[in-house]
Structure formats: C-alpha cells, structure tokens
UniProtKB/Swiss-Prot annotation:
Coiled coil: none annotated. This is CASP-like protein 2D1. Its main location: membrane. Homodimer and heterodimers. It comes from the Eukaryota. GO terms for cellular component: plasma membrane. Keywords: Cell membrane, Membrane, Transmembrane, Transmembrane helix.
Length: 186
C-alpha cells in the first residue's frame, strides 16, 4: 500500500481526533465538585488539568485545520508533507506530556503521597475524580490517533523522498531520468 492508499485511514484518524479532543476538553473543563465539609475543587485549581484542557483545544483546532488542508488536491498538499509531519509529531508530544501531568494528578488524588503530606481526595470528591478519569481516557484515545497519524505522515514524507513526484508533464524529474540512464561500470 502506497502513501496514496493511506488517504482514507488518515482522514478517518484526523476526523476522530476532533470529537475525542473536544469531549476530553468538555469533560475536564466542566469538572467541579463542592462539598460542605471539604470545600470546592475545580479543574482550574490544578495546573496539570488546565494544561490538558489547553492541549485538547490546540490539538482539536489543528485536527480541523489539517482535515481542511488535506482536502486540497494532492500536488498542493504534497508541498506541506514535512509541515504535517512536524505538526503531527508536536501534537502527539503535547498529548503525551499533558496526559502524563493529568495522570500524575489523578494518581495523587486517588492514593495521596504520605511523604509530602498529600492526602487522597477521591473519597471526598469522587465525581470530580471520575470525570477527570473519563477525560484522561478520551485524551489517551486522541493520543493514539495522533501516534498513528505520525506514522502515516512519516511514511508519506519518506516514501516520497525515495520516489520523487512527476513533473507537470507527467514525467519523472530530469535528475531522476538522468540517473536512470546512467550506466555504472565496475
């Protein structure tokens, strides 16, 4: 299967990222719980959760932009393959770092850390922890999509480097024709 054969799965992955990122964003951004005894907790009280919301917004916006950009005809889109590869990689890395930050906060909320006198909080704010867990799971699914997209983008870039696209007249580029005609003698 060539790079052109990956067009439909690539578009499907890009389209999947949008609702996954937006659902994760919504689940976390609407996450707050109040308790008469222990007060209130909101996602914005914890920087790791705020970071997750921000990264979800950025990756959803990029996914929409990349769907629009990849809907152009291939010769125009081919010029931007390197940009798409770098942006897919950057999105995947942002998703990894924000997932890591949110997972650490959830771990502390569930189990605490006696060494630094951080008590567990999920027994008091169970709904908050549940929504944060759902948001993190949706975020991980978006991460899986971007990991696959990074592989597809890399395949496209590096397979096109080995086989240059034809000129406007449908012929291989002049340097490729010259290389094919050269005879090597040992």
């Amino acid at each position: 299967m060539g790079a052109a054969g990956l067009k439909v799965p690539e578009m499907a992955l890009r389209l999947c990222v949008v609702p996954l990122s937006l659902a994760s964003l919504w689940e976390m951004a609407s996450n707050a719980q109040a308790d008469d005894t222990y007060g209130e907790v909101k996602f914005s009280d914890l920087s790791g959760f705020s970071y997750l919301v921000g990264v979800n917004a950025v990756t959803a916006a990029y996914a929409v932009a990349s769907v629009l950009a990849s809907s152009f005809k291939r010769p125009l889109a081919a010029r931007y393959d390197w940009v798409v590869l770098v942006m897919d990689q950057a999105s995947a890395y942002l998703l990894v770092t924000s997932a890591s930050a949110a997972a650490e906060l959830l771990q502390l909320a569930r189990h605490g850390d006696r060494g630094v006198s951080w008590g567990e909080a999920c027994s008091y704010f169970g709904r908050f922890c549940g929504k944060a867990t759902v948001s993190l799971a949706l975020h991980a699914a978006a991460l899986a999509c971007f990991a696959a997209l990074s592989l597809v983008s890399a395949f496209r870039v590096f397979s096109s480097r080995c086989h240059p696209p034809p000129d406007a007249d449908g012929q291989p580029p002049k340097h490729a024709r010259d290389e094919e005609q050269r005879v090597y003698h040992y």
